[in-house]
Amino acid sequence: MASLKNKHFMIGLSLTFIVALFSFLAAKLPILDKVGALTIAILIAILYRHFRGYPEQYSSGITFSSKYLLRFAIILYGLKLNIFDIIGQGSKLLAIDVGVVIFSIVMMLFVNKLLHGDKNIALLLGVGTGVCGAAAIAAVAPIFKSREKDTAISIGIIALIGTIFSLIYTAIYAIFSMTTNVYGAWSGVSLHEIAHVVLAGGFGGSDALKIALLGKLGRVFLLIPLTIVLILIMRFRSSESSSKGRISIPYFLIGFVIMALVNTYVTIPSVLLNILNTISTICLLMAMVALGLNVAFKDLKNRALKPLMTIIITSICLSSLAFIVVHWLYS
């Protein structure tokens, strides 16, 4: 019996790995490189669920990917941060980053209320839009006690919209006259994922990409204080409503902070850093596959439309406002 359970666990884990690896490699191909590995992984998982059903007998391995590998990926995500670089970028860019995070969450909740959408998904999308997409959503989902299908829907939506917006940014840069500093800062402070920032920022050249990444990594850094604030708010609301539900601290975020400190104070060889970043990406993709397997098409039909409209409206407002502020400060 134990050997059978172990076999089912390994099959479930292998399923998420195979789809993740395929998505990782497929995202390097022309056209698909614009779609992104996250979007590919989630779409394949949802399609698998639709045509083959949820592989219940392999759920232990799938659940391991969606929980533990996801947390491990977020811990390694901290290696993308160098605190000295973020502090050294100056107060202007960091101040914009703070404004972007606050605006994204508040605007998302405001639009969601007008559309009578799901508040939990709106919160996840607000944090994801303001900070760093899928990783931020996965980090705060335990704080909000989000269901796995809501987390998967949110990540799928933000991966899709971020890809579309990054392509729109490149078109705008090609058509309109814009300095590399303005374009880079605009991309960095307003696009959803690091991959989207790289896609759009790289189109403006190395100088634009450099300032874009600084702007984006400043937002990633803000994940640390943001989660602390969210935990305090949720605990206050929980005690105020005399709820017995305890708001737990996502301790893997401590690992995220430790990795950020390690990358700041320790010189890690570039080869090792690239290997660790690849491992982080694969683990994150495996988690996305596992989350996607929890989403049925009826869930997308019933729960994704309003959040999709909400994030589009919010992203348009964010991009417009960010451009005005960046143009004013960097022109």
Curated annotation (Swiss-Prot):
InterPro entries noted in UniProt: UPF0324_pro (IPR018383)
Regions crossing the membrane: 9-26, 31-48, 69-88, 93-115, 122-144, 154-176, 183-202, 217-234, 247-269, 273-295, 308-330
Its subcellular locations are: Cell membrane
Task: State the UniProt keywords alphabetically.
Answer: Cell membrane, Membrane, Transmembrane, Transmembrane helix
Family assignment from sequence similarity: Belongs to the UPF0324 family.
Work out whether the entry's keyword set contains Endoplasmic reticulum.
no
Q: Which domain of life is it from?
A: Bacteria
One Gene Ontology cellular component annotation?
plasma membrane
The name on file for this protein is UPF0324 membrane protein SA0329
Identify the taxonomic lineage of the organism of origin: Bacteria, Bacillati, Bacillota, Bacilli, Bacillales
